[in-house]
Amino acid sequence: MPPVPRQTPVGSSRRFAHLSLRLLLLLIGMFTAALGVALTTVADLGTTPISTVPYVFTVLTGYSFGTTTFFVNIFLVAGQVLLLRRRFSLWNLLQIPTVLIFGICIDLAMAIVSPHAPAGWWTGLLMSISGNFVLAFGIVMQIRSKTIVQPGEGFVLAAAAVTRKSFGSIKIVNDVTLSLIAAGIGFVCAGELIGVREGTVLSAVLVGLFAKLIVKFVDRLGVFVQAGAAAIQEPQPPQPHESAITAIQTSEETNDQLTDERSSVQNRQ
């Protein structure tokens, strides 16, 4: 049996630096996403579908938006455990401290944005659209960090894996369900809709659209960067520290990755 190669100090420091950069990208992405949520919420046209339930509890109980976001997401982590059972990895429990940080980011973002509430419907619409773009940008950064998914996305991924449906289809069902739950709680407890309005529908459409546009731009930018790097050195295989810390992949996503890899190989040839 060949001897196992020892990890050199240079290799260890490189792995640590790479992981640190990914975690930094995750943190920046979380605050950016929180800022997007704050913008759409303060616009007063309805918050994002994933934030409707926490926002209703914030209005009804007086707890901060970040606090209710944390507790609602704890239930989403529990939902992943129920859906995946033995397939649930303990690594996915890292979503709990991650969403705690995200909740703090939301409270900070709300404190920054709240004093700048729009005066009319049109300015509110502009703020809502801007918030959706900022939110999409934050989501893309979190995904590109290849670290830890938020419980909201983790729950959808788990449901997609169990039902063998596409992520997009389950995401739509999840958003509609959360919005209906928030609307029901608002009607029962306050006799009116709370946080669910035209802006909620707008967010359901625009966030995904903006995210696709941002990804295309980033990918095109990456092509130029990779082309320059390829001219200097041969492409290297992915390193272990470049893999995701937590990941629940559906069969569709796996096939997409294989297709991307084949296309990359063909382009190099």
Question: What are the language-model segments listed below?
Answer:
Residues 1-252, 256, 260:
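Core subunits and conserved enzymes of cellular information-processing
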Residues 265-269:
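Short, charged juxtamembrane terminal tails flanking transmembrane helices
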